[in-house]
């Protein structure tokens, strides 16, 4: 029996020596790339969904919920609209001579003075907003023969009747209202904005009581323009106890030009001018609170970071902002194609290269080597190819941001009712621009993703070809990203292959000799394990048959006695 056990042990040892990976005269070297268990899906030109190891979101889809007061100068309109602050509504006196980068109008803002309308409200609002200041300068207009500084109970300042502080309500003096003809030259080197108005009484009696004449007229002109307004006497809806109205108009006087005002009644005269400045100031309607923080980009929803090239928070923006697109998400690949590692590598734990799958757990680089030799197994990253890929991918995000960030704000656009067709056309144009930008954004990201994946695949192939050129006939390409090395290759030898100092000639004779000693037929990697198992099973079966035959022979000779008891 001891002899049988000894023979079985010797047989198993011989069999074990023939298993893959146990031949000290060969080694296996595989090349592979980084992989993660769960990658990120991105779009490319050729594939709607391809998994990569890492990706960056390009669409900013949320705001901070507050408007940052830095670096832009924010002026909170509170209860006042910009036009009320411009006219000098008594409850907006705190805004006189204020300056801003962005004027924030609130939904709670209201007028609390004489009822008025501005026929070209949007243009005036935009002009003043872009000027960025309510800086006002009084001028000495000569209104001889009329009473100045009219007021109304609809416009209270404390307990007293008042009026817009930037306007001068003129009405009759005693029983006369002479024809007014006043000029004011612009001798400065900047544009001046004059605000004036026309009063529309609710009844003929109110008209004559204030202006004597049954019908007034106001003409304001410069060398470049002229406006003549005839008051419309008649009742209107009651506002703050009044059914009369004031229409507000405005005139810009260029340097060297002259302002001429001619009227025989109903004139709401200017007290001076606003200095017009050119700049990038703007206005925005928002109820977001103003907070102490820093952000270059502001939307009505609040400030947003501008570290991404696109946003879908709001179409209205101020500052250096990401481009508005319709998509909720656009992901830029910043890693390579992800092929998760298979958890089992055959029944003998063989290693595999990049052709079959990626490698998880590579923390030192994107590309690397795994080896199996007489000293065991090991893994190391290839820093050169990793750095080459990273250098080309780095800066992709910044380049996309540079291509897409708005350098100027997207202002709110308003049109009066009579300009409805213009508004519809403008909306169509704006929607078309957004559709176009959304398409361009998706195409741009898909192109960049395709380039990234092709680039990282190329670096893997370059590393593989570099290794092949070093090994030459000393090794065989196994077809799965691995090389079978036909000479003894310890860890120092493997290291020389990785760092490019491998000397092919040193191992050439040994490799050729080992090639000739290999069996004539070498099975492919997919079937080898199964054949070995079958061979092992047959060998064990034959061993059992031999053992059983020996026992039966011994029983016949009388050397072994077998008793069967029932």
Swiss-Prot record:
Signal peptide: 1-16
Chief localisation class: virion
Disulfide bond sites: 30-482, 68-293, 80-92, 113-155, 297-321, 489-493
GO cellular component: host cell plasma membrane; membrane; viral envelope; virion membrane
Keyword Cell membrane annotated: no
PTM comment, free text: Palmitoylated. In natural infection, inactive HA is matured into HA1 and HA2 outside the cell by one or more trypsin-like, arginine-specific endoprotease secreted by the bronchial epithelial cells. One identified protease that may be involved in this process is secreted in lungs by club cells.
InterPro entries: Capsid_hemagglutn, Hemagglutn_HA1_a/b_dom_sf, Hemagglutn_influenz_A, Hemagglutn_influenz_A/B
Ranges of the Cytoplasmic topological domain: 552-566
Membrane topology: Single-pass type I membrane protein
Keyword DNA-binding set for record: no
Residues the record marks as site: Cleavage: 345-346
Residues bearing carbohydrate: 24, 38, 54, 79, 142, 181, 301, 499
One of the record's GO molecular function terms: host cell surface receptor binding
Other notes: Major glycoprotein, comprises over 80% of the envelope proteins present in virus particle. The extent of infection into host organism is determined by HA. Influenza viruses bud from the apical surface of polarized epithelial cells (e.g. bronchial epithelial cells) into lumen of lungs and are therefore usually pneumotropic. The reason is that HA is cleaved by tryptase clara which is restricted to lungs. However, HAs of H5 and H7 pantropic avian viruses subtypes can be cleaved by furin and subtilisin-type enzymes, allowing the virus to grow in other organs than lungs.
Protein function: Binds to sialic acid-containing receptors on the cell surface, bringing about the attachment of the virus particle to the cell. This attachment induces virion internalization either through clathrin-dependent endocytosis or through clathrin- and caveolin-independent pathway. Plays a major role in the determination of host range restriction and virulence. Class I viral fusion protein. Responsible for penetration of the virus into the cell cytoplasm by mediating the fusion of the membrane of the endocytosed virus particle with the endosomal membrane.
Protein family according to the UniProt entry: Belongs to the influenza viruses hemagglutinin family.
Protein name: Hemagglutinin
Native organism: Influenza A virus (strain A/Memphis/18/1978 H3N2)
Name of the encoding gene: HA
């Amino acid at each position: 029996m001891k002899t049988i056990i000894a023979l079985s042990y010797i047989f198993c040892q011989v069999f074990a020596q023939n298993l893959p990976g146990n031949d000290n005269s060969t080694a296996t070297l595989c090349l592979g790339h980084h992989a993660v268990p769960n990658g990120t899906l991105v779009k490319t030109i050729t594939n709607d969904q391809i998994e990569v190891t890492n990706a960056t979101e390009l669409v900013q889809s949320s705001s901070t919920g507050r408007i940052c007061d830095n670096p832009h100068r924010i002026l909170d309109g509170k209860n006042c609209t910009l036009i009320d602050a411009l006219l000098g509504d008594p409850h907006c006196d705190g805004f006189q001579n204020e300056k801003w980068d962005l004027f924030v109008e609130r939904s709670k803002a209201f007028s609390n003075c004489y009822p008025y309308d501005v026929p070209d409200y949007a243009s005036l609002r935009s002009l003043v907003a872009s000027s960025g200041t309510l800086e006002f300068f009084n001028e000495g207009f000569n209104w001889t023969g009329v009473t100045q500084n009219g007021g109304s109970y609809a416009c209270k300042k404390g307990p007293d009747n008042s009026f817009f502080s930037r306007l001068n309500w003129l009405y009759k003096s005693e029983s006369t209202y002479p024809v007014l003809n006043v000029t004011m030259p612009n001798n400065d080197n900047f544009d001046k904005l004059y605000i004036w108005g026309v009063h529309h009484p609710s009844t003929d009696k109110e008209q004559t009581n204030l202006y004597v004449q049954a019908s007034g007229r106001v003409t304001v002109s410069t060398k470049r323009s002229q406006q003549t307004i005839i008051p419309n006497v008649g009742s209107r809806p009651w506002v703050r106890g009044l059914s009369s109205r004031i229409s507000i108009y405005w005139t810009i006087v260029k340097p060297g030009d002259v302002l001429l005002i001619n009227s025989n009644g109903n004139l709401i005269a200017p007290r001076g001018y606003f200095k017009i400045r050119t700049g990038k100031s703007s206005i925005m309607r928002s109820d977001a609170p103003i907070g102490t923080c820093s952000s270059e980009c502001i939307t009505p929803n609040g400030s947003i970071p501008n570290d991404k090239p696109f946003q879908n928070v709001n179409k209205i923006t101020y500052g250096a902002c990401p481009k508005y697109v319709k998509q909720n998400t656009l992901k830029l690949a910043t890693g390579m194609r992800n092929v998760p590692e298979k958890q089992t590598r055959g029944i003998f734990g063989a290693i595999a290269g990049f052709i079959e799958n990626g490698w998880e757990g590579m923390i030192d680089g994107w590309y690397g080597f795994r080896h199996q030799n007489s000293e065991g197994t090991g893994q190391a990253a290839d820093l050169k190819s990793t750095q080459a890929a990273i250098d080309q991918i780095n800066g992709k995000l910044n380049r996309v941001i540079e291509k897409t960030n708005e350098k100027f704000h997207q202002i709110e656009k308003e049109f009066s009712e009579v300009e409805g067709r213009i508004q519809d056309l403008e909306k169509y144009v704006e929607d078309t621009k957004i559709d176009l930008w959304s398409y361009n954004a998706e195409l741009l990201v898909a192109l960049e993703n395709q380039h990234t994946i092709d680039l990282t695949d190329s670096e893997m192939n370059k590393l593989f070809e570099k290794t092949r050129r070093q090994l030459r006939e000393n090794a065989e390409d196994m077809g799965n990203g691995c090389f079978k090395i036909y000479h003894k290759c310890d860890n120092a030898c493997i290291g020389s292959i990785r760092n490019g100092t491998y000397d092919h000639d040193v191992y050439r004779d040994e490799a050729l000799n080992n090639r000739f000693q290999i069996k004539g037929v070498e099975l492919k990697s997919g079937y080898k394990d199964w054949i070995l198992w079958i061979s092992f099973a047959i060998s064990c079966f034959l061993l059992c048959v031999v053992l059983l035959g020996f026992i039966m022979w011994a029983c016949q000779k009388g050397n072994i006695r077998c008793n069967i008891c029932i």
